[in-house]
């Protein structure tokens, strides 16, 4: 099945306390329409991590998928950077 049309995001893992699920925060910079200043906005996603590889602090790439639970609509695609912290 072709997966080219699914949305992908890059974010930082903030929690791995759930079974096969990680919480990832994605920072988005938007320009204020009136003043032109860049404003940082954050959004948290619950991402399915089948092999439980990602740890807090890791930079991950994840993609859209079918609904896996009430809150999970994304799955882990690739770990881009492993964090050095012991958490």
From Swiss-Prot:
It comes from the Bacteria. GO terms for cellular component: cytosolic small ribosomal subunit. One of its GO terms (molecular function) is rRNA binding. It holds the Pfam family Ribosomal_S17. InterPro entries: NA-bd_OB-fold (IPR012340), Ribosomal_uS17 (IPR000266), Ribosomal_uS17_bact/chlr (IPR019984). The keyword RNA-binding applies. Keywords: Ribonucleoprotein, Ribosomal protein, RNA-binding, rRNA-binding. One of its GO terms (biological process) is translation. Gene3D superfamilies: Nucleic acid-binding proteins (2.40.50.140). CDD domains: Ribosomal_uS17. One of the primary rRNA binding proteins, it binds specifically to the 5'-end of 16S ribosomal RNA. Belongs to the universal ribosomal protein uS17 family. Part of the 30S ribosomal subunit. This is Small ribosomal subunit protein uS17. It comes from Aster yellows witches'-broom phytoplasma (strain AYWB).
């Amino acid at each position: 099945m072709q997966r080219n049309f699914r949305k992908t995001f890059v974010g930082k893992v903030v929690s791995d306390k759930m079974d096969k699920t990680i919480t990832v925060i994605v920072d988005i910079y938007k320009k204020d329409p009136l003043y032109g200043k860049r404003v940082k906005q954050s959004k948290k996603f619950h991402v399915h991590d089948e092999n439980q590889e990602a740890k807090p602090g890791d930079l991950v790439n994840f993609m859209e998928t079918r609904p896996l639970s009430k809150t999970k609509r994304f799955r882990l695609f690739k770990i881009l950077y492993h964090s050095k912290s012991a958490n």
